[in-house]
A protein has these predicted regions:
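HAD-like aspartate-dependent phosphatase fold
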Residues: 1-109
Length: 109
C-alpha cells in the first residue's frame, strides 16, 4: 500500500529501506532556516543505521553548500551527506575531460 508521506512522515517507512535520496531545498531547509522535523527524521535514519544522501541541483561544489548549511545551524554529521549537481559536474570533468576544451553556459563563477 502506498503511504502519503505528507501525512504520515518519512519516519513511517524508515524501517522499510536502507538508503534514502532526499532533496535538500524545500525539504530539509527553506533557504533561511532548517525544517526541524526533517532534521529529526535524518537523525532517526542515522540511529537506525540507515543511509541517506541530501541532493541538490545547486551548481556549486559540495563544500560551498555545506558552508551555507553550517550558517543555518546544520550539524556536521548531517552536512556530510550533501551531494550537489555542481560536484557531479566537477567530478565528471576531472575524470573524463580535464584536458579537453569545453564551453560553459551559465552565470560566471
Amino acid at each position: 500500500m502506498t503511504k502519503n508521506l505528507d501525512k504520515v512522515g518519512l519516519s513511517s517507512i524508515v524501517d522499510d529501506y536502507q538508503l534514502f535520496y532526499i532533496d535538500l531545498w524545500g525539504v530539509v531547509h527553506n533557504g533561511v532556516s532548517l525544517h526541524e522535523k526533517a532534521i529529526n527524521t535524518l537523525k532517526e535514519i542515522t540511529k537506525k543505521d540507515k543511509e541517506y544522501v541530501l541532493l541538490t541541483n545547486a551548481p556549486r561544489p559540495n563544500s560551498a553548500v555545506k558552508i551555507f548549511l553550517e550558517k543555518m545551524g546544520m550539524e556536521k554529521e548531517i552536512r556530510d551527506h550533501v551531494y550537489t549537481s555542481g560536484e557531479a559536474a566537477l567530478s565528471y570533468l576531472n575524470k573524463n575531460h580535464f584536458d579537453d576544451k569545453f564551453f560553459h553556459i551559465g552565470p560566471p563563477r
